[in-house]
């Protein structure tokens, strides 16, 4: 049984031979996708269970609505001063659309070289994507074959093998980082000068 499992695992990890010159179907945006062997975090995994709705007393609900209506009437009677929203006011110096840095002009040879480099990179990522996909498919087939052989040997071991592993979650992973860490980096203390203007709302009584 152990020999059969080792043979299946070795066959799964065997690299797929790629013959140069074969026709490769193009996959759009393959070079921008994550690796198939990486851990994909889905939206339902980041969700939380629904909270149980609490029973609301109708009298408390009606009292809260009455207080809100009273507050609205009080605000309607008093004419309040409008506070300017500075976050939506664009400074005049940012409205100048003149470009400060001149655009760099590339020669025809440089443009062709960059286009060819991008195509080669896309082809490389496509081949890497296909190799990872085939490796995953082979590992799944080998796992299924090993489980079938284990089921023939012992049903108890098969039940233990397909049991859910509770130690896998919560899953923690660090990286990959876009840039390497800076050695001996001293983080700033976080001091800043708050220049936010504070407005006082004045109520006028009639």
Curated annotation (Swiss-Prot):
Q: Which Pfam families match?
A: MRP-L28
Q: Where in the cell is it found?
A: Mitochondrion
Membrane-spanning ranges: none
Instruction: Name the segments for region: Disordered.
Output: 170-190
Q: Which UniProt keywords apply?
A: Mitochondrion, Ribonucleoprotein, Ribosomal protein, Transit peptide
- Subunit structure, interactors included: Component of the mitochondrial ribosome large subunit (39S) which comprises a 16S rRNA and about 50 distinct proteins.
Q: What is the protein's name according to its record? A: Large ribosomal subunit protein mL40
Instruction: Give the species.
Output: Rattus norvegicus (Rat)
């Amino acid at each position: 049984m152990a020999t059969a499992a080792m043979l299946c695992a070795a066959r799964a990890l065997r690299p797929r031979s790629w013959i140069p010159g074969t026709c490769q179907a193009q996959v759009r945006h393959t070079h921008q996708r994550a690796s198939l062997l990486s851990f994909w975090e889905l939206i339902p995994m980041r969700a939380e269970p629904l909270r149980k709705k609490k029973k609301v007393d109708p009298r408390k609900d009606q009292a809260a609505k009455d207080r809100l209506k009273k507050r609205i009437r009080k605000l309607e009677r008093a004419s309040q001063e409008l506070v300017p929203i500075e976050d939506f006011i664009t400074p005049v110096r940012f409205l100048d659309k003149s470009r400060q840095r001149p655009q760099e002009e590339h020669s025809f040879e440089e443009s062709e070289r960059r286009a060819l480099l991008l195509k080669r990179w896309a082809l490389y990522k496509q081949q890497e994507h296909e190799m990872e996909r085939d490796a995953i498919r082979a590992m799944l087939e080998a796992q299924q074959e090993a489980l079938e052989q284990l089921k023939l040997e012992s049903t108890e071991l098969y039940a233990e093998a397909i049991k859910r592993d509770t130690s896998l979650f919560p899953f923690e992973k660090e990286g990959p980082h876009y840039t390497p860490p800076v050695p001996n980096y001293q983080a700033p203390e976080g001091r800043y000068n708050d220049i936010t203007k504070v407005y006082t709302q004045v109520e006028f009584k009639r």
